[in-house]
Swiss-Prot record:
The chain crosses the membrane at residues 323-343, 359-379, 408-428, 464-484, 507-527, 687-707. Belongs to the RBOH (TC 5.B.1.3) family. The lineage of its organism: Eukaryota, Viridiplantae, Streptophyta, Embryophyta, Tracheophyta. The keyword Oxidoreductase applies. CDD domains: EFh (cd00051), NOX_Duox_like_FAD_NADP (cd06186). It is a multi-pass membrane protein. It comes from Solanum tuberosum (Potato). Ca(2+) binds at D211, D213, D215, R217, E222. Residues 1-20 are annotated as: Disordered. The gene is RBOHB. This is Respiratory burst oxidase homolog protein B. Monomer and homodimer.
Amino acid sequence: MEIENTRDSDSMRGSRVGFSGSLVSGKKSARFKDDESYVEITLDVRDDSVSVQNIKGADHEAALLASRLEKRPNNTLGSQLSFHLRQVSKELKRMTSSNKFQKIDRSKSGAARALRGLQFMNKNVGTEGWSEVESRFDQLAVNGMLTKSLFGQCIGMKESSEFAEELFDALARKRCITSPAVTKDELREFWEQITDTSFDARLQTFFDMVDKDADGRITQEEVKEIISLSASANKLSKIQDNSDEYAALIMEELDPGNVGYIELYNLETLLLQAPSHSMNLSTNSRVLSRMLSQKLKPTKERNPFKRCKRRLDYFIEDNWKRIWVMALWLSICAGLFTWKFIQYKRRAVFDVMGYCVSVAKGGAETTKFNMALVLLPVCRNTITWLRSRTKLGKIIPFDDNINFHKVIAFGIAVGVGLHAISHLTCDFPRLLHATDEEYEPMKPFFGDERPNNYWWFVKGTEGWTGVVMVVLMIIAYVLAQPWFRRNRLNLPSTIKKLTGFNAFWYSHHLFVIVYVLFIIHGYFLYLSKKWYKKTTWMYIAVPMILYACERLLRAFRSGYKAVKILKVAVYPGNVMAVHMSKPQGFKYTSGQYIFVNCSDVSSFQWHPFTISSAPGDDYLSMHIRTLGDWTSQLKTLFSKVCEPPTGDQSGLLRADVAKADYKPRLPKLLIDGPYGAPAQDYKKYDVVLLVGLGIGATPLISIVKDVLNNIKQQKNIEDGTKGSKRSPFATKRAYFYWVTREQGSFEWFKGVMDEVSENDQEGLIELHNYCTSVYEEGDARSALITMLQSIQQAKSGVDIVSGTRVKTHFARPNWRQVFKRVTINHPDQRIGVFYCGPQGLVGELRHLSQDFSHKTGTKFEFHKENF
């Protein structure tokens, strides 16, 4: 023990005493399991009192309890100090041995931490007032009594009616209420206890819920029942199935004496064991966090011109690549339209057809250009080569190739509209109603006899080709819309069969016919007779040849890239993992994708799937989620040859061809690729933030594995392993956030999670799993799951939800806090943010990337995978 005594030079009235030493000796308690845990306590000693001035140390609970020291008269410094140190030690022992529930006075920080772990009630309940509950009582009550079945709806917990009924029973038992209904006054008492935010009240409520017979003790059977209930409320089927095992685990932890029950103080001991991660933040991190919060506060610029200028500056900064590409495209379209418009304004036909013919020909010229340009963004091999082998990616947004393809398609629609409408509603009617004298200059183009009706124009080659093209374009455009392509509309079954990905796929191939008709239509022109003035073929010749070569290359390459299937796993959640042999010379980058064909399902359909294996692996793997007809049929084929699940793998089917004595007949797969994708740019960043939702984690898992392989490689170089060469790998830190709805989803990448945990000794890869089916930490319905998770993690290092060494968080991440933490850890750096998942989260992540980039020195560059 060390004692430090410092006295004020001007006055002898006060002094501070520092103590550093072990607060607990002898037998270890559940709260203080390490005899070598020390704390430093600084006491402020006055003439007639002693108070705690400062507490530092390894165990935050010592600080919590030491704050209870009362002010007492000071006889001598030595005796007073000794008395209070004994009091601290005595208090610690009392807290770990008492079997009576008492009110505990805690420091502000300790109470805040405890409440974060014990805010049992649904946040919707906590935010509502009694007036709302009373109003619902008046609506739901019958003869002034509210039944147990309506209790959850009344207090705002209607989504978990079963759990609400358990809460009702606990509150009723406490008050000796045996009726299955309560009055308004009794409900008011229930409400006051539910909304009491003190640590002790909520701990007591939780204890009462578990203690079914109200004897003040919890048996293993009662623990099992509440585990099963909590698991059911959180859709954790595996925990529910193993509730016996987990109940025994809790009893083993809290009932070391094997007396057969646990009491309230046992729960308190467990729940107040270790400070949370946020409590261990360094002082510098806290200061930075506060400063960052101030920076990120929205500031309202009063001057509207300055406000608009700032928004414009931010917009240009975030979208300059898109801006210059769009500006160039619009300029070319406008230039072509203007050139053709002026050209026809100077021709003799203008006197009869007027501005209509100029508009029609201007629209036709832009259509020629766009029909040529629309093929380039879908030349996948060319785009991949430009992205991977050149530096054009610094100025060209290759990530937006599909979006640009859609924009060009819209430009085609505008051009076709201008061309067709101007002809059909304006210049053709003018020609039909022209006098003989006015028609005279038109004879070289339309013949000696003036057309007498619309049918004359339609039956000609120029007419019927145009009509057929427009019809085919409309079909392809409509079926390509996400409402039809992803089957988002509730359509009758007969019509629904005509939509979906298959309809999109086949209708898009109608453009082969469209391009043939487009060339014919552009050759048989009314107003241009010389071949060199018929420029349609000149526009589209090179793009069509390039696209045709792409398709031939795909067909040739896929023909000899038949892969051997090594292993198949069909997981819960309609996900299937396929491990294949890697074709000779097949090179790829994490984040890229391949097209897959299975002739047993369809000889013509090719579907894209991201590669989930890392470039350094000796196999190829992909994870496929069954969402449509093709993937459903593929899963059915593989399921027939898979083995049934073992006892610890609920719903998991496997077919390990490499190890099996009997070689099952598996479907034959062809692959085409790899092709470039936004996620492959991760190597450009020292730090990456990877966000995946559900099956969207696939490309990001490949990145995580690649970063891990690079860590191993660099370690070999540092250890002097021969033959190792340093690769141009910039990524030094990765944050991976995976959000999924179902517990079974964690089976998909369980091996990768464990491998990272075992090999990443320096913590360069942070893995964060979130299960949204579990109520957020602090909710009553997940309280016991959180407790069980802590015990299991401490005992075996395995998370009970994911089954991996990575701890699972509940509900959804606070993305602003995620960005804030990365900003604090990496000031003034470029962070690559890569997202793959549904469209719903894109806006929030893009906004946060822009907001933090604008207001801090850390620059976040957002990349979205086309999902």
